[in-house]
Amino acid sequence: MSAAEKKPASKAPAGKAPRDTMKSADKKRGKNRKETYSSYIYKVLKQVHPDTGISNQAMRILNSFVNDIFERIATEASKLAAYNKKSTISSREIQTAVRLILPGELAKHAVTEGTKSVTKYSSSAQ
């Protein structure tokens, strides 16, 4: 065979697996998991109203609400730590952020419950 009669080189790079086998490897990874507060919301609902259920849409709305409040508090606490030239967010920054974000009575109750929870956690950790 002369140089003019040789077959053109294949377009696929040597050493790489064909695409269809790579797709089957992706299938083995499993589902992408979404982390939500659904189980915790459900537990609180059952503590407050044992005979009441909740729809999927209502659960999605509450989950979105919790994520939103969490993000607001974390952002505000981060700003407070930066103002005070601290690299760590402590319970004090969280408490101040809650007071700044939540209105009136709601902030007072949130701070009280938060303090109670931190105290309970600290005493059980020892």
From Swiss-Prot:
Changing P103L: In HTB1-223; impairs growth at 36 degrees Celsius, leads to chromosome missegregetion, chromatin shrinkage, histone H2B deubiquitination and diminished chromatin silencing. It comes from the Eukaryota. Monoubiquitinated by the rhp6/ubc2-bre1 complex to form H2BK123ub1. H2BK123ub1 gives a specific tag for epigenetic transcriptional activation and is also prerequisite for H3K4me and H3K79me formation. H2BK123ub1 also modulates the formation of double-strand breaks during meiosis and is a prerequisite for DNA-damage checkpoint activation. There is a cross-link at K6, K7 (Glycyl lysine isopeptide (Lys-Gly) (interchain with G-Cter in SUMO)). Residues 1-34 are annotated as: Disordered. Changing K120R: Impairs ubiquitination. The modification Phosphoserine is found at S10. GO terms for cellular component: nucleosome; nucleus; site of double-strand break. Keywords: Acetylation, Chromosome, DNA-binding, Isopeptide bond, Nucleosome core, Nucleus, Phosphoprotein, Ubl conjugation. The modification N6-acetyllysine is found at K6, K7, K11. Its main location: nucleus. Residues 17-27 have a biased composition (Basic and acidic residues). GO terms for biological process: chromatin remodeling; double-strand break repair via homologous recombination. There is a cross-link at K120 (Glycyl lysine isopeptide (Lys-Gly) (interchain with G-Cter in ubiquitin)). One of its GO terms (molecular function) is chromatin-protein adaptor activity. It is found in: Nucleus; Chromosome. Transmembrane segments: none annotated. CDD domains: HFD_H2B. PANTHER family: HISTONE H2B (PTHR23428). Core component of nucleosome. Nucleosomes wrap and compact DNA into chromatin, limiting DNA accessibility to the cellular machineries which require DNA as a template. Histones thereby play a central role in transcription regulation, DNA repair, DNA replication and chromosomal stability. DNA accessibility is regulated via a complex set of post-translational modifications of histones, also called histone code, and nucleosome remodeling. The nucleosome is a histone octamer containing two molecules each of H2A, H2B, H3 and H4 assembled in one H3-H4 heterotetramer and two H2A-H2B heterodimers. The octamer wraps approximately 147 bp of DNA. Interacts with rik1. Belongs to the histone H2B family. This is Histone H2B-alpha. It comes from Schizosaccharomyces pombe (strain 972 / ATCC 24843) (Fission yeast). The lineage of its organism: Eukaryota, Fungi, Dikarya, Ascomycota, Taphrinomycotina.
